[in-house]
Amino acid sequence: MTEETIGSRRRAAVRLKAARKHKPSSQKWLLRQLNDPYVAAAKERGFRSRAAFKLIELDEKFGLIGKGARVVDLGAAPGGWTQVALERGASRVVGIDLLDIDPIAGATLIKGDFQDESMETALAEILGGPADVVMSDMAPNTTGHTATDHLRIMGLAELALDFAFKHLAPGGAFVTKLFQGGAQGDMLNLLKRRFAQVRHAKPEASRKDSRELYLVATGYRPDAS
């Protein structure tokens, strides 16, 4: 056994011992993090969150982020999706969040509400044109009540879609997170009218016990009614 292996096992043992000192809910989260290969892979590749791998999978499946693309990341903190957009060839990436985001080389990060009227002027200056991709991995603070959480995330998705309608270029793509439930019918009907293709996907990086899925709409048609 090498010194590196021994050291790695010792560090894991220390983290496990530390996790056992927390209350059960925190302990469960810490243990899950320790055993999650995507958490380890994110650290290894320098991504700020395991969610980065969800966008990688979605992009590989649907070809969302072309070279030179202009991308807007809504609810961007801590920045994993913004990092992926840059890595996959986007030329201009804007991350927007109410929370602070540590700087990311090559990206413009804005602390604020993407619904503010002032955002439109700022984006036009930064992007130099309409966005090719508007993406949102936003999620509400969950209550544990399935129906309530579903309605809350639908509210966020609708706000993101309204933003996309204002800022997407013809042929552009929209990606948003949802929780499984029955309230997305009207949104899907609208998307099918305004985009050439609308699909659902649950990336492998999504946890098995998670109700999340991603709605991916491509081929934006701004003049469709």
From Swiss-Prot:
A Pfam entry, by short name: FtsJ
Enzyme class: transferase
Keyword Lipid metabolism set for record: no
Keywords assigned by UniProt, alphabetized: Cytoplasm, Methyltransferase, rRNA processing, S-adenosyl-L-methionine, Transferase
Disulphide bridges, residue numbers: none
Active site: K177 (proton acceptor)
An example Gene Ontology molecular-function term: rRNA (uridine-2'-O-)-methyltransferase activity
EC number: 2.1.1.166
Stretches that traverse the bilayer: none
Catalysed conversion reaction: uridine(2552) in 23S rRNA + S-adenosyl-L-methionine = 2'-O-methyluridine(2552) in 23S rRNA + S-adenosyl-L-homocysteine + H(+)
GO cellular component: cytoplasm
Entry's localization field: Cytoplasm
Presence of the UniProt keyword Methyltransferase in the record: yes
Residues that coordinate or bind S-adenosyl-L-methionine: G79, W81, D97, D113, D137
HAMAP family: RNA_methyltr_E (MF_01547)
Protein purpose: Specifically methylates the uridine in position 2552 of 23S rRNA at the 2'-O position of the ribose in the fully assembled 50S ribosomal subunit.
Homology family: Belongs to the class I-like SAM-binding methyltransferase superfamily. RNA methyltransferase RlmE family.
Protein name in the entry: Ribosomal RNA large subunit methyltransferase E
Upper classification of the organism: Bacteria, Pseudomonadati, Pseudomonadota, Alphaproteobacteria, Acetobacterales
